[in-house]
């Protein structure tokens, strides 16, 4: 575990299919990410999937892995110290989409208690991420050309009230 990593918020049994990330999840997920997610990380920060996942793991105070019914990783998401939230997934996330949506909304609400502002930028073309963010209660602030490739992204936010 990286130095300075904050103690994980307690994940109760009720959060089925989401567990604390271990670094081997990065190795497993990197070559399997969705095309849309690969494009989003390349256009925003110019990293390859392995670099993006490793960076997310190392820079996030809280990092979680989404697993299927056989405990196989299908995605990762996390939050950095300033409330920057992110999600990267494989195409297999569609197989567990209903349970993931139900559980991730609970986890995002729990995260929002710790981080009063959750925010980031999302590629306007990444429909799965846009739907997930809306489902979890995020609001879209503005559309701007963003990142190393200056592609259209939405800035999004969720405030704890």
List each model region and its residues.
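C-terminal "cap" of GNAT-fold acetyltransferases
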Residues: 146-161
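Conserved GNAT-fold acetyl-CoA-binding loop/helix
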Residues: 35-53
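Conserved acyl-CoA
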Residues: 103-118, 136
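Conserved beta-strand in the GNAT
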Residues: 65, 70-86
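A short beta-loop-alpha structural element at the N-terminal edge
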Residues: 5-31
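A short, internal acetyl-CoA/4′-phosphopantetheine-binding micro-motif in the GNAT/acyltransferase core
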Residues: 86-102
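Conserved beta-strand-loop-alpha-helix junction that forms the acyl-donor binding cleft
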Residues: 118-134, 139, 145-150
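A short helix-loop-beta-strand connector motif used in the catalytic cores of GNAT acetyltransferases and
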Residues: 53-65, 116, 151
């Amino acid at each position: 575990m990286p130095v300075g990593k904050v103690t994980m918020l307690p994940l109760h049994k009720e959060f089925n299919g989401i567990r604390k990330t271990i670094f081997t999840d990065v190795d497993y997920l990197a070559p399997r990410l969705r095309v849309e997610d690969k494009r989003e990380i390349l256009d925003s920060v110019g990293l390859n999937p392995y670099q993006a996942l490793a960076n997310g793991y190392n820079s996030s105070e809280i990092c979680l892995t989404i697993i299927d019914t056989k405990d196989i990783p299908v995605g990762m998401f996390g939050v950095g110290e300033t409330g920057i939230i992110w999600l990267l997934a494989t195409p297999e996330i569609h197989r567990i989409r209903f349970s993931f949506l139900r559980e991730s909304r609970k986890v995002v609400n729990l995260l929002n208690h710790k981080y009063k502002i959750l925010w980031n930028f999302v590629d306007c073309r990444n429909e799965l991420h846009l739907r997930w963010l809306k489902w979890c209660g995020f609001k879209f602030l503005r559309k701007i050309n963003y990142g190393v490739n200056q592609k259209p992204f939405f800035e999004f936010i969720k405030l704890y009230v």
